[in-house]
Amino acid sequence: MPMYLLDGKRIWVAGHKGMVGSAIIRSLASEDCEVIVADRQKLDLTRQEEVEKFLLKEKPHAVIMAAAKVGGILANDTMPADFIYQNLIMEANVIEGSFRSGVEKLLFLGSSCIYPKYAAQPIREEALLTGPLEPTNEWYAIAKIAGIKLCQAYRKQYGANFISAMPTNLYGPRDKFDLNSSHVVPALIRKAHEAKIKDLGCLSIWGSGTPTRDFLYSEDCSDALVFLLKHYSETEHINIGSGGEISIIELAHIVCRVVGFKGDIVFDTSKPDGTPRKLLSSERLVSMGWRPKTSLELGLAKSYESFVSNVADN
């Protein structure tokens, strides 16, 4: 399929105020296109009628579905109904509404948690649905898998050019730094910052510190998404990863160095670790000519700067 040109296109970014959505807006600024956004107060994505009216009125040529209810292990464990229902209903409404309103192309943003807990590493796209999920985030994962299948179903039945991309663990400006709902990177940044400010002697972290993860800066992810919107039109979902992995304990040491916390790091092994290892294979995306640009330490420094400027006193 030929390249999808963005020149003169109207592109709706759903979830534009989130970490990824806001990064997508910045990436699209260099394209000759018109970006459409809608605040939550004006458009409730869980209301099908509102979504369809918005799409029929705005008539976007392309849609990037970056809106989602997200959170870490604690949030997923305590609010399973919210995580599965809200994500299912939002993605179904946006995908169905996009089809009904004649959207030319849709990019659905998933998550690496869709893969089995013990998938062979690095995880390739074909590992989907080959084994049981990680129990600590299965509710969110099931909703995201459904989003992939919705895109594939509309393509199969109607020929819709709907694609899906699965990024690895993301971090960056506008991340969620609330300890009750955050992922590991923003949680570590907040904990290290507060430990430094309070002059604490140690920093306590969930789990053993041994699991390894693949982390990607949000600006690199948004760059990949715009690249895929232009160059990818296949049925199968495609991974977006950094190409490297790091243990949680190594990550914690880098965060402490960036933040300036000089105390000890202790691990609370009574808390769950989650999946022991998760590294995405980005071989397909790299073969198309895309690569990430931001080192982990630089990305963490930018994330901490954003946290201090916008969140630290809240």
From Swiss-Prot:
Positions that bind NADP(+): 15-21, 109-112, 144, 167-170, 183
Keyword entries, A-Z: Isomerase, Multifunctional enzyme, NADP, Nodulation, Oxidoreductase, Plasmid
EC numbers for this chain: 1.1.1.271
Pathway: Nucleotide-sugar biosynthesis; GDP-L-fucose biosynthesis via de novo pathway; GDP-L-fucose from GDP-alpha-D-mannose: step 2/2
Swiss-Prot/TrEMBL site (Important for catalytic activity) positions: 111, 113
GO biological process, one term: 'de novo' GDP-L-fucose biosynthetic process
InterPro entries: Epimerase_deHydtase, GDP_fucose/colitose_synth, NAD(P)-bd_dom_sf
Residues noted as binding substrate in the record, renumbered to the chain: 191, 206, 213, 273
Active site positions, chain numbering: 140 (proton donor/acceptor)
One family name in Pfam for this protein: Epimerase
Similarity section: Belongs to the NAD(P)-dependent epimerase/dehydratase family. Fucose synthase subfamily.
Function (record text): Catalyzes the two-step NADP-dependent conversion of GDP-4-dehydro-6-deoxy-D-mannose to GDP-fucose, involving an epimerase and a reductase reaction.
PANTHER family: GDP-L-FUCOSE SYNTHASE
Name this protein carries in UniProt: GDP-L-fucose synthase
